[in-house]
Amino acid sequence: MAEKFTQHTGLVVPLDAANVDTDAIIPKQFLQKVTRTGFGAHLFNDWRFLDDKGQQPNPEFVLNYPEYQGASILLARENFGCGSSREHAPWALTDYGFKVVIAPSFADIFYGNSFNNQLLPVTLSDEQVDELFKLVQANPGITFEVDLEAQVVKAGDKTYSFKIDDFRRHCMLNGLDSIGLTLQHEAAISDYERKLPAFMN
């Protein structure tokens, strides 16, 4: 079972860039591991650090600003997560501490991978995202509330509705990944296997 996602209130960091690809999110030299942990240290490595080893923070990159330390909601521009289909991208984002990414659009594979890893991708219109960027930039350190049950983002004095597939919403609300979904039908699977002819077992 994965962690259930119903509602999250968190600090918002504005990444004012479109077409952020998966190689920028987690560069290929850090993909040797097959476990989900440890990737957060290398999130946006080529942007966050001035050296290849990740020891000299880039003071001009937004994630390194003092006011955004501990951010758990990432605000981005269109086509977030484009490029190769590596699942390491949502792994890196969640391992860093992000729970939500808000953008006008997402690459399809990244969008699906995010749900599989309990990272909520929230799609709002370009105009709404523009409003949110202005709000965050005028109020560094602001928090948003993201309510998956009600399907709304509460930011300042405004509330923004977002759409999400019913099945994906159900899975996130109940903390169900592919393994959890399978285990829901464990009894039926066992019953089916018992009925198989012996030579098929």
UniProtKB/Swiss-Prot annotation:
Keywords: Amino-acid biosynthesis, Branched-chain amino acid biosynthesis, Leucine biosynthesis, Lyase
Source organism, top-level taxon: Bacteria
Gene Ontology process terms (BP): L-leucine biosynthetic process
EC number(s) recorded for this UniProt protein: 4.2.1.33
Family recorded in the similarity comment: Belongs to the LeuD family. LeuD type 1 subfamily.
GO cellular component: 3-isopropylmalate dehydratase complex
Enzyme class: lyase
Subunit: Heterodimer of LeuC and LeuD.
Short name of one Pfam family: Aconitase_C
Lineage per the UniProt record: Bacteria, Pseudomonadati, Pseudomonadota, Gammaproteobacteria, Enterobacterales
Stated name of the protein: 3-isopropylmalate dehydratase small subunit
Its biological purpose: Catalyzes the isomerization between 2-isopropylmalate and 3-isopropylmalate, via the formation of 2-isopropylmaleate.
Catalytic activity: (2R,3S)-3-isopropylmalate = (2S)-2-isopropylmalate
GO molecular function terms listed in the Swiss-Prot or TrEMBL record: 3-isopropylmalate dehydratase activity
Gene: leuD
Pathway assigned to this chain's UniProt record: Amino-acid biosynthesis; L-leucine biosynthesis; L-leucine from 3-methyl-2-oxobutanoate: step 2/4
